[in-house]
A protein has these predicted regions:
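Structured alpha/beta reader/binder surfaces that contact nucleic acids or chromatin modification marks
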Residues: 2-4, 11-13, 19-166
Length: 166
């Protein structure tokens, strides 16, 4: 079995903000913004832990994100790229839903050449920052950023993008 560390979520170029560690230590993973091909908006994604939707939680700490290094306004229709998709409670699901994440093109080729296969384990890590309340508003605490593992997925089946039905 191989164990693969995979960085996911927002960074300084895509998203422009870390995932959120709430003052009570609840973790909020923030997927990167999506492009015009995405169908899921941040307001449709449950932030988990009784916090409401991702759009509302993100808007508490910032009104903007980044996409391709450019400022992106956060509003209920802002699309997100939900990858990895690990939590059945984040979005309405069809019966039989399974956790998944996607790699395409060069990234998929790297995994194939490395012999990544059924049974291997992905550990997902990302950039997170502690928050605190300042003047009654949720804000990121300066100097409290960390990289941490936030999820995992064991490969049940590999599906190559060129083999997917259209």
């Amino acid at each position: 079995m191989k164990v693969i560390l995979s960085r996911k979520g927002c960074d300084s170029d895509f998203g422009g903000m870390p995932g959120i560690i709430m003052p009570d230590d609840r973790i909020v993973y923030i997927p990167i913004p999506g492009d015009d091909f995405e169908t899921i908006a941040y307001h449709e994604v449950n932030a988990g832990n009784g916090l409401g939707n991702l759009c509302d939680v993100i808007s508490q700490v910032s009104l903007h994100m980044k996409m391709y290094g450019k400022k992106l306004e956060i509003n209920p229709e802002t699309k997100c790229h939900l990858d990895p998709d690990l939590d059945a409670g984040m979005y309405p699901r069809k019966s039989g839903w399974r956790g998944c994440f996607g790699q395409a093109d060069a990234a998929q080729t790297v995994l194939k050449k490395a012999g990544v296969a059924e049974g291997d384990l992905f550990l997902f890590f990302g950039w997170f920052n502690r928050t605190c309340y300042k003047d009654g508003k949720l804000r990121f605490c300066k100097g409290q950023g960390i990289h941490m593992i936030f999820g995992w997925l064991q490969i049940e089946k590999v599906i190559y993008t060129h083999e997917m039905p259209v």
